[in-house]
Amino acid sequence: GSLAAWLGGGRNRFALITGLGYAFTGEATGLRKLLRALIQQLYRFSLSRNRLVFFQNPDDEALFRQLNLLKPAIPSRVVNGSGVDVAEYALSPLPETPSFLLIARLLGDKGVREYAQAAALVKQRFPDVTFRLVGWIDDNPDAISQAELDAWIAAGSIEFMGKLSDVRAAIANCSVYVLPSYREGTPRTVLEAMAMGRAVITTDAPGCRETVVDGRNGYLVPVQDVSALSESMIKLIENPEQVAAMGARSRQMAEEKYDVHKVNKAMLKEMGL
């Protein structure tokens, strides 16, 4: 987008970095190392022609400065993700029985494997608890295989719902939303679940940690820590009143911090529009 604006002669150019993706997660070896080097060069070139760059979390902003992907002379701002329409994603009542949900592309760095492994552990103690997965298999090098997905379904660990054009019914049918991602910009699905009044379990990782105040509207767990993830799930199964209280705080945070109209207004102000 920045390159197109420059080639088109646009004078006031702005960029929004929404997340860093496959090339910036995991160890930089093989294809990932090559992609990372290429993408970094593209960022250096394209962002050098912007008036202002927006980031969705402070970790990404710091990384771009550290790697010199963004010249010191170019200002940057951190915004609260892309926001969520709190009217469209309205508060909904909790289901009567505990259930968990993950919505994601079926990639390793989204924490899909950890979610399935934690589900299997929890179901040993609580066999009636439901773990649903919404998403699709991607052609990304980090993609979950069809065989893995089939094994989780056959074992009864996961209920797979496929790709949904509207996720609101799926969120309404869960009591807790889970995203064990390795890195995000600001995860939109978490914001949607928060707006609908759901407690959240996510990772203490860039982009994810900003959405949860640990112990207030959910829990933060270390990246790739299946044990901590399953323990947090069990805490919420055993304390339904906490699920309701955390969900109410999530809704409050969505209204106060992540309302799309507030986010857009803040960005337009920074852009001088």
Q: How would you label these PLM feature ranges?
A:
Residues R11-N12, Y22-S46, A62:
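Nucleotide-sugar donor phosphate/pyrophosphate-binding loop at the beta->alpha transition
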Residues A228, K235, Q242-K257, V263-A266:
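A short, well-ordered alpha-helix in the C-terminal region of glycosyltransferases
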Residues A199-T202, V212:
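Short hydrophobic beta-strand element within catalytic cores of glycosyltransferases
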Residues Q40-A90, L102:
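Donor nucleotide-sugar binding/catalytic pocket of nucleotide-sugar-dependent glycosyltransferases
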Residues I103, T130-I144, F160:
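Glycosyltransferase donor-sugar binding loop
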Residues S82, P93-K110, Y115-A120, F131-V134:
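Conserved donor-binding/catalytic core segment of Leloir-type glycosyltransferases
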Residues D214-G215, Y219-V226, K235-P240:
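Conserved acidic donor-binding segment of nucleotide-sugar-dependent glycosyltransferases
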Residues K163, Y182:
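Aromatic "clamp/platform" in nucleotide-sugar-dependent glycosyltransferases that forms part
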